[in-house]
UniProtKB/Swiss-Prot annotation:
PANTHER family: OLIGOPEPTIDE TRANSPORT ATP-BINDING PROTEIN APPD (PTHR43297), PUTRESCINE EXPORT SYSTEM ATP-BINDING PROTEIN SAPD (PTHR43297:SF4). Signal peptide: none annotated. The gene is sapD. GO terms for cellular component: plasma membrane. It comes from Haemophilus influenzae (strain ATCC 51907 / DSM 11121 / KW20 / Rd). One of its GO terms (biological process) is peptide transport. PROSITE patterns: ABC_TRANSPORTER_2 (PS50893). NCBIfam families: oligo_HPY. It is a peripheral membrane protein. This is Peptide transport system ATP-binding protein SapD. It is found in: Cell inner membrane. Belongs to the ABC transporter superfamily. Keywords: ATP-binding, Cell inner membrane, Cell membrane, Membrane, Nucleotide-binding, Peptide transport, Protein transport, Transport. Residues 1-259 form the ABC transporter domain.
Length: 349
């Protein structure tokens, strides 16, 4: 069952020069109890989508969607107050740069205790006194911090990046959310610390059944932990599929470029071996290409790519491309004409 179901999400930002469309018709579906990945380079709209889900919306954002459901509740149709209450209870987010999200003038212990909501107390009334401190210690132990006394007595600037990230995870799970969004949780972390964070999130998914959405610009690093991956480019869906299928046989050129950009160290590389890169640069927000936004950089682009590609589906594999790769032309035509693979966002309402 889909815990989060988003169809045709558009995010525009009102500026002095008019509206700029950042996210263009994105679909996203998260099944309950799974770890899903949202992959794309900087500027693809990953963080914007995550903030919209968490209701961290600015006044100059214009948000529309055919469907924006969380557990069968249409979030965009709720009043701001009801949406804030629902999201605050059911969804948590771990932001980038954890140390910058903490109050530098207050100790970690006080911030963590203040972040624990009263409704999570489910014990006898006489155990109320001091329960938040006990709960804070329990949360720190759960995220792998054994020496809780030093951490709780420290200020944010006295923590390492890894400790700061673990503290942010402890704060995020204090309200026992059904959905946890981790916005590039291993950004700027050492490889060993990043591995600890991924293992921690994975154990939370397995032990507590928490649904997790990971955003990243490194498709290989999160492919080891995610059940499903969706790829974005400049605010548009390119491809979505179960992780193993997506990595082994991507149908969109951009997904293939992301995979090729990661060096394969299983075999020795030759002297001055060039890394796999996609030619060109991402367009600026004010000058997005019409149609497929990858068109100017795509090695397979043709005139038809000036039209926005339809979103097609073959079994569990969804992609938006006029000229998909890793598909035999004959089989592709047979599959796409035999059944209606064009996704209809309004069909399930």
């Amino acid at each position: 069952m889909a815990l989060l179901d988003i169809c045709n999400l558009n995010i525009e930002i009102q500026t002095s020069n008019g509206r700029i469309k950042i996210v263009d018709g994105v679909n996203l579906s998260l099944n309950e109890g799974e770890i899903s990945g949202l992959v794309g380079e900087s500027g693809s709209g990953k963080s914007l989508i995550a903030k919209v889900i968490c209701n961290a919306i600015k006044e100059n954002w214009i948000i529309t969607a055919d469907r924006f459901r969380f557990h069968d509740v249409e979030l965009l149709k709720l009043s701001p107050n009801k949406r804030r209450k629902l999201v605050g209870k059911e969804i948590s987010m771990i932001f980038q740069n954890p140390l910058s999200c903490l109050d530098p003038s207050r100790k970690i212990g006080k911030q963590l205790i203040q972040n624990i909501p009263n409704w999570t107390f489910k014990n006898k009334w006489w155990k109320w006194f001091g329960w938040k401190k006990r709960r804070a210690i329990e949360l720190l132990h759960r995220v792998g911090i054994k020496d809780h006394r030093d951490i709780m007595a420290s200020y944010p600037n006295e923590l390492t990046e890894g400790e700061g990230q673990k503290v942010m995870i402890a704060m995020a799970v204090a309200n026992q959310p059904r959905l946890l969004i981790a916005d590039e949780p291993t950004n700027a972390l050492e490889s060993t610390t990043a591995l600890q964070v991924f293992r921690l999130l994975s154990s939370m998914n397995q032990n507590q059944g928490t649904t997790i959405l990971l955003t990243s610009n490194d498709i290989k690093s999160i492919s080891e932990w995610c059940d499903q991956i969706s790829v974005l480019y400049c605010g548009q869906n390119t491809e979505s599929a179960p992780t193993e299928i997506l990595i082994e046989s991507p149908h969109h050129p951009y997904t293939q470029a992301l995979i090729n950009a990661v060096p394969d160290f299983t075999q020795p590389l030759g002297f001055k071996t060039k890394l796999g890169t996609l030619e060109g640069t991402a367009p600026i927000l004010e000058q997005m290409p019409i149609g497929c936004r990858l068109g100017p950089r795509c090695p397979f682009a043709q005139k038809k790519c000036m039209e926005k590609p339809r979103r097609l589906k073959i079994k569990q594999h969804e992609f938006s491309c006029h000229y998909p790769i890793n598909l035999r032309e004959k089989n592709f035509k047979e599959k796409t004409t035999a059944t209606p693979f064009i996704l209809n966002c309004k069909g399930n309402e």
